[in-house]
Design a protein with these regions (language model features):
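Bacterial Sec-dependent N-terminal signal peptides
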Residues: 1-16
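Cationic-aromatic interfacial patches
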Residues: 13-85
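Residues that form generic nucleotide/phosphate-binding pockets
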Residues: 32-35, 50, 54, 105, ...
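Acidic/His-rich structured neighborhood in mature extracellular/periplasmic domains
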Residues: 57-183, 195-198, 203-206, 216, ...
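Contiguous, non-catalytic segments that form substrate-binding/exosite surfaces or channel walls
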Residues: 188
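Short, surface-exposed secondary-structure edge patches
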Residues: 191-195, 211
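C-terminal soluble interaction/assembly domains
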Residues: 204-268
Length: 268
């Protein structure tokens, strides 16, 4: 146990010596990402340590785009983040040796594959809905149903991107009917967290969103079965904190339940 603790401290000490990622040029980022790959050969460990390096990054909602209309934001960036951008840019970066490769990997993760197997940045091909991504994107695989007995899972059916009045939530010419299982608040505890791997994704369910064709209001990463790293609009930056303390406030739970997912390398 002492050795493990020392190893964790050593990792954090090295990360603390690095310049903050949002202050770096593309060349400086490329140099440091090579060191992450060499220092942390294990995929999940590298993702965890890279995510810790992001703590403190300024928050900006909806900050990735296609660099062309209708969304001219950058395809890949390190200067700001929101909850989903933290997940996607971290996943892309840890599978890369430089800035350009991270951008290329981000495209593979953030956009649906076309009929010819290509990933082309396009607003309508983006994985806009976290629920859709967890159920069908191989980089972020839903594990919610494996964590509890069937009777402890809440289930809903909804049509993604279809509002209660039948209109689309986003102008995508796309809807999808899905069945979603999530863990209700009365089942969220330390025992549940101990069932997770050392790093796992968490997505927060908001029932009031169902009528808009949405299920997920926020997402982040659970590390070491107890802490959450997430880009927070409330804190205006990426933060690391105790998950249960964050989720259960004096006024009650922040959300109506959660989904969990695991992270996976790109194929091919």
């Amino acid at each position: 146990m002492i050795f493990i603790f020392y190893g964790c401290q050593k990792n954090q000490t090295w990360i603390d010596t690095l310049p903050k990622p949002w202050t770096l040029s593309e060349a400086e980022f490329s140099s440091i990402i090579k060191k992450f790959n060499k220092r942390y050969p294990d995929f999940n460990d590298r993702l965890k340590q890279f995510s810790k390096w992001q703590v403190g990054k300024p928050y900006k909602i909806f900050c990735l785009g296609e660099e062309t209309l209708p969304d001219v934001d950058p395809i890949f960036r390190m200067d700001v983040s929101d909850c989903t951008v933290h997940i996607l840019t971290s996943l892309a970066s840890i599978q890369s040796q430089n800035w350009n490769q991270a951008k290329s990997n981000l495209i593979k993760i953030h956009y649906k594959t076309g009929v010819n197997g290509e990933n082309i940045p396009s607003y309508k091909k983006r994985w806009h809905f976290t629920t859709d991504r967890l159920l069908f994107n191989p980089s972020t695989k839903n594990i919610t149903d494996s964590l509890l007995d069937e009777q402890d899972i809440q289930r809903i059916s909804l049509i993604l991107n279809q509002k209660q009045n039948g209109d689309e939530f986003l102008d995508l010419d796309w809807t999808k009917k899905v069945s979603v299982g999530y863990i209700p608040n009365n089942m969220i505890n330390n025992e549940l967290l101990n069932e997770l791997p050392s790093i796992a994704g968490i997505a927060f369910v908001k029932k009031s969103y169902f009528k808009m064709g949405l299920a997920i209001a926020h997402e982040g990463m659970i590390i070491d079965n107890q802490s959450i790293i997430h880009a927070s609009q409330e804190y205006e930056k990426t933060v690391l904190m105790n998950f249960l303390d964050y989720y259960f406030t004096d006024e009650g739970p922040r959300f109506d339940g959660v989904m969990f997912f695991t992270f996976h390398p790109l194929r091919g």
